[in-house]
Regions:
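Ferredoxin-type iron-sulfur electron-transfer modules and their immediate structural context
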Residues: 1-141, 229-249, 338-343, 369, ...
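Rossmann-like dinucleotide-binding cores of NAD(P)H-dependent redox enzymes
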Residues: 164-167, 171-201, 207-208, 288-335, ...
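Conserved hydrophobic helix-helix packing surfaces used for dimerization/oligomerization
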Residues: 142-144, 165, 275, 299, ...
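FAD-site-proximal beta/loop scaffold in flavoenzymes
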Residues: 247-273, 356-420
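A conserved short coil-to-beta-strand element within the FAD-binding core of flavoproteins
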Residues: 208-220, 330-342
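N-terminal Rossmann-like FAD-binding beta1-loop-alpha1 element of flavoenzymes
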Residues: 141-166, 284-292
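Beta1/beta-strand and adjacent pyrophosphate-binding region of the FAD-binding site
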Residues: 137-150, 271-281
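Residue-level detector of alpha-helix initiation sites
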Residues: 81, 148-149, 173, 281-283, ...
């Protein structure tokens, strides 16, 4: 019996560099100045209202137009300390750029994301006086568990206020989703770690890696040692398909596939000749597109509901299709097709809506595959933080500032109930929690970021 066609090195060596290069190359200075001049600099700007972090978009764009890169970066990073990453991965087409007045008038919004990236990257490339200087030490110690976007934002905000922060993470690197969970072409050039280096440069943040809550540390232990705890745990579990899933080469979780690509040279990552990705979100798109970029000949995304139910944005769907990915809706996984321990494909049941409920039509079909990637969502594992913390919808219940049911414990990011699983929203959670923790400790101050714009 022929083995599954699952292997690495499907492309010529030179192809990998181009395939996994920056998906959206940055603007040069001339392009940025021209694009900045398109902004109306609206008063009460709808783009700013649409941004979860309240980024003063007209202000930073006006500073770009004035060739004041430091001032533009100051405006961005004061609202969003992960402004460089968000410039790369935010779904701007459904947030700030959708709200742009130019979008209404001309169907072509100002390229806010690219301008934000231009300003932040430009500032990082220019050594000079730091935008943020740590406040006078308070003597208070805060544990931040999880070094993804929410945890990083919380740690930075707390350190800026003079608190000593220990930043715990289960992985070998800081960054969480930014380091392990995004397509390589979205964050090319090692930007995730460059941004983290900048965040840590404020001082007062001590990373502790390879340290997992529930295994190496406990919430009770942290509360005994620290004045407050922020949980930015993300979603550690992966949803199962709900069918028998034998252990087979090529049958794996999409998040693990994406993480492997982020931490390895692409030429050593194995991919099937024919790939099926089950799911309809951005993780599914990232896995499907990267499978094509690795040399897969046929990649099919399969989603159980109709096109309107896909959680991947229209932009992401079009991105997948332009890279040769087939998106097939109205089908649910029924069985793994295997023979002699070799993956051969997936059997699906065709579906439809009947009185608002998803039902099978009675039709079945098989999509041949050497590789099947599960991308049907992730779950919060409650056992890590313990049963004492209240949940809502399977995630941690909090108030608007991130305070949980436990005294001295805050939470934010994907582990927090009611969110949209957006990086920019996680940053806002961490930012607001830092303010709330500072206030709860009785140390809220009237300090403000230095807003004096100078040329970088």
């Amino acid at each position: 019996m022929d083995p599954a066609d699952l292997k690495s090195g499907r492309l010529a060596p030179a192809d990998y560099a181009s395939h996994f290069a920056d998906a959206h190359p940055p603007l040069n200075r001339t392009q940025a100045l021209i694009e900045a001049e398109r902004c109306y600099y609206c008063f009460d700007a709808p783009c700013q209202t649409a941004c979860p972090t309240g980024n003063d978009i007209p202000a930073f764009i006006q500073r770009i137009a004035q060739d004041n890169i430091r001032g533009a970066a100051d405006a961005i990073l004061s609202a969003n300390p992960l402004g460089g990453m968000c410039a790369r991965v935010c779904p701007t087409e459904v947030l700030c750029e959708q709200a742009c007045v130019r979008n209404t008038n001309e169907s072509k919004p100002v390229e806010i994301g690219l301008l934000q990236r231009f300003a932040v990257d430009g500032h990082f490339a220019r050594p000079g006086k730091p935008l943020f200087e740590r406040g006078m030490p308070t003597g208070r110690r805060i544990a931040v568990v999880g070094a993804g976007p929410a945890g990083l934002a919380a740690a930075h905000g707390l350190a800026w206020r003079g608190h000593d922060v220990t930043l715990f993470d289960a992985a070998a690197k800081l960054g969480g989703l930014n380091e392990y969970g995004l397509a390589t072409y979205k964050v090319a050039g090692g930007f995730a770690q460059r941004e983290i280096d900048w965040l840590l440069s404020i001082g007062g943040i001590t990373p502790r890696l390879n340290t997992r809550l529930g295994r190496d540390i406990t919430l009770d232990g942290l509360l005994a040692e620290y004045d407050a705890v922020f949980l930015g745990l993300g979603l550690q579990g992966v949803n199962a398909l709900g069918i028998a899933e034998p252990e087979l080469p090529g049958l794996r979780d999409a998040v693990d596939f994406i993480a492997e690509l982020r931490q390895s040279a692409p030429e050593i990552v194995a991919v099937g000749r024919r790939v099926v990705v089950i799911g309809g979100g951005m993780t599914a798109v990232d896995a499907a597109v990267q499978s094509k970029l690795l040399g897969a000949e046929q990649v099919t995304m399969v989603y159980r509901r109709g096109p309107d139910g896909l959680s991947a944005s229209l932009h992401e769907q079009q991105w997948a299709q332009t890279h040769g990915v087939t998106i097939r809706c109205w089908a649910r996984p029924l069985a793994v097709e295997a023979e002699g321990g070799v993956l051969r494909g997936m059997r699906f049941a065709a579906t439809r809506l009947e009185n608002g409920k998803l039902v099978d039509t009675g039709e079945q079909f098989v999509v041949e595959a050497d590789m099947v990637l599960r991308a049907i969502g992730q779950t919060y594992r409650a056992e890590a933080a313990g049963s004492a913390i209240a949940l809502e919808g399977g995630r941690i219940k909090t108030d608007a500032d991130g305070a949980t049911s436990l005294a001295r414990v805050w939470a934010g990011g994907d582990c927090r109930a009611g969110g949209r699983d957006l990086t920019v929203e996680a940053v806002e959670h961490g930012k607001r929690a830092a303010i709330a923790i500072d206030r709860a400790l009785g140390l809220a101050t009237a300090r403000h970021f230095d807003q004096e714009a100078t040329h970088g």
